[in-house]
């Protein structure tokens, strides 16, 4: 049997909701948290800035995800930096990525989790109250793969868990910094994507994930 071919492309971008003008980036901010990485791919790639002062715009191409990719899983890690001078929340919204053919790759076939939340440096604000990654996203989907009764790989959380604007993270103030982005004035966390190569109906599809940071629930420092 000839293996089929299926590609999946994800665009990760941001929207900032923090006011207007220069203050817009000061109060609530998302940027690159470092260089994104991809492992286990055949013909895949991930592009994005490694500079934490640059905007977060990442394109993920999982490449070949049929059984002709003999790696156990394709994993992508995207570091994301966030800054705020107030309590905040981060929401994710996924658009696209669905197929009419149930045998084609679907949003539920792409694991999505968030973890590795840590301070950037000396100007990161340390608070008593915790920063919370919300269920079901607090996991590394590449290490939590199961095969269901139909033989399809499943994950604790997937792209399908964010097809409406969904809060993934919230907490108290993040930064002690000044009026502009710095390399040490916030926190970084990882967005982790996972896709298990298997038989899918032929084709290529794409999805876009938009991350939005805005004022969050009351969470004193």
Feature names for model-found ranges:
Residues 117-161:
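Low-complexity, serine/threonine/proline-enriched polar segments
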Residues 6, 71, 109, 159, ...:
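N-terminal compositionally biased, intrinsically disordered segments and leader/signal-like regions
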Residues 75, 146-148, 152-181:
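Local beta-strand/beta-hairpin segments that build beta-sheet-rich folds
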Residues 9-19:
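Bacterial N-terminal signal peptides
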Residues 1-10:
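Bacterial N-terminal signal peptides that target proteins for export
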């Amino acid at each position: 049997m000839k293996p089929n071919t299926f590609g999946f492309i994800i665009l990760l971008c941001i929207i900032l909701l923090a006011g207007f003008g220069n203050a817009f980036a000061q109060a609530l901010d998302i940027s690159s948290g470092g260089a994104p990485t991809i492992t286990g791919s055949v013909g895949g790639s991930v592009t994005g800035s490694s500079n934490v002062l640059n905007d977060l715009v990442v394109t993920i191409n999982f490449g070949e995800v049929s059984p002709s990719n003999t790696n156990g899983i394709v994993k992508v890690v995207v570091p994301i930096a966030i800054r705020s001078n107030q309590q905040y929340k981060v929401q994710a919204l996924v658009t696209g990525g669905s197929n009419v053919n149930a045998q084609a790759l679907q949003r539920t076939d792409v694991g999505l989790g968030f973890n590795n939340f840590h301070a950037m440096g000396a100007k990161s604000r340390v608070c008593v109250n915790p920063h919370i990654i919300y269920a079901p996203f607090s996991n590394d989907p590449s290490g939590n793969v199961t095969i269901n009764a139909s033989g399809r790989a499943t994950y604790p959380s997937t792209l399908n868990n964010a097809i409406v604007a969904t809060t993934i993270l919230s907490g108290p103030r993040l930064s002690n910094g000044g009026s502009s982005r710095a390399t040490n004035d916030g926190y970084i966390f990882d967005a982790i994507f996972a896709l298990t190569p298997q038989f899918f109906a032929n084709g290529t599809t794409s999805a876009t994930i938009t991350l939005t940071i805005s004022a969050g629930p009351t969470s004193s420092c």
